[in-house]
Amino acid sequence: ERLKATPANLNGLLDALGERQAVLVGNDWGASIAWQAAQVRPDRFRAVAALGVPMMGRAPMAPSRLFPQNEQAWFYTHYFSAPGVAEAEFERDIPATLRKIYFCASGAMGPRDGGTPNPFGMVPRGGGLLDSLTDPTALPPWLGAADLERSVQAYTRSGFRGGLNYYRNLDGNWQAQAAFAGLRIEVPALYLVGEYDTGLAIPGMRQIIDAMPLLAPDLRGSQVIARAGHWLQQEAPDAVNAALVAFLRAL
């Protein structure tokens, strides 16, 4: 149950470093882990900042039942959960896979509406996630060719299965969340999200963000970074750093 193990690992890291407390900053999956760690060990993690993924309560049902699917299409989490399916698609042409996902989840795609290509939306049955995504003619300014090549080499060595296995344990993590029911984030918190983040296209996500003070009563800010997408700290590093530094100085 990674939901329990990873915060425990962070606690162990503090012990190994000889530190009594730390401030956590997490992005995407790391944001979920940072929220969880601050929730269960506020004595060790005295503040938390999260990028992209807001603090949210436990869903009323398991993700496999919650996320949409029908005869024509299924939500990307279902597609990722099918063993071997996404791996086969993504590993067929790793450079193209990364170009498409990085570009189409970025702020370059503009506002997230029903017609915006989204790597993290509905996937046609019998088709692939990459089919509808734009392959850019040039890399966005925040993604250098050398950086992309390092990612290509890393995924060529490892494949995509390790990351995709996260989605295959969503129901397990949901079950583990029951142990933390009723716990709030009692330490100071900060939330940052890109104006064009793909997650904002998920139904109900904006309402979840608006309701965060109920779960994190010491939320010091919920900031939307203009024109940035899912890769927030890469697309808008100056804005992210400024927000983090201001948050840390006020603790």
Question: What positions do the PLM features span?
Answer:
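Catalytic active-site module of serine/aspartate enzymes centered on a nucleophile-bearing elbow/loop
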Residues: 217-251
